[in-house]
Amino acid sequence: MSKSSLSKSQSCQNEEMPLCDQPLVHLEQVRQVQPEVMSLDQAQQMAEFFSALADPSRLRLMSALARQELCVCDLAAAMKVSESAVSHQLRILRSQRLVKYRRVGRNVYYSLADNHVMNLYREVADHLQESD
């Protein structure tokens, strides 16, 4: 496999990370940062949250919902997938409180859960648009 055919994440895994020439623990910095390191439970919860985002289908749903509130039928049509596929992905996003819904008569409309989610989505999208 040529280097050019590797994805960005694969090529990063093959690069050697720079390390200190001589290991030296800076105790004062360690003492300052140690209380701020999240607990294993918090890290697990955050990993599950990011795992919900680590799927192209769910990110495509979020990109549509970042534009406007939509029902499952409209999301399925926009993404050219089945309603059951959209429902399945929305269930995962809801489990992490990334999307919410409201019922109007027989219709159910989905939107991003709040400004935190909208800001997270926009910040990542903006970050990916930046050039190095």
Swiss-Prot record:
Residues bound to Zn(2+) are 20, 26, 71, 73, 114, 116, 127, 130
- Description of how the protein assembles with itself and partners: Homodimer.
The segment(s) forming the HTH arsR-type domain are 38-132
Outcome, altering residue 73 to S = Loss of ability to respond to zinc. Still capable of binding DNA
Keywords of this entry: DNA-binding, Metal-binding, Repressor, Transcription, Transcription regulation, Zinc
Gene source species: Synechocystis sp. (strain ATCC 27184 / PCC 6803 / Kazusa)
| InterPro entries xref list | ArsR-like_HTH (IPR011991), ArsR_HTH (IPR018334), HTH_ArsR_DNA-bd_dom (IPR001845), Metal_resp_trans_reg (IPR051011), WH-like_DNA-bd_sf (IPR036388), WH_DNA-bd_sf (IPR036390)
Q: Know the name of this protein?
A: Transcriptional repressor SmtB homolog
Report the function annotation for this chain: Transcriptional repressor of the expression of the ziaA gene. Controls zinc homeostasis by triggering ZiaA-mediated efflux of excess zinc into the periplasm.
Q: Name one Pfam family in it.
A: HTH_5
Any one GO MF term held by the record is: DNA-binding transcription factor activity
Which NCBIfam families does the record cross-reference, listed alphabetically?
HTH_metalloreg (NF033788)
Q: What is the lineage of its organism?
A: Bacteria, Bacillati, Cyanobacteriota, Cyanophyceae, Synechococcales
Q: Which SUPFAM superfamilies match?
A: Winged helix' DNA-binding domain
What are the DNA-binding region positions? 72-91
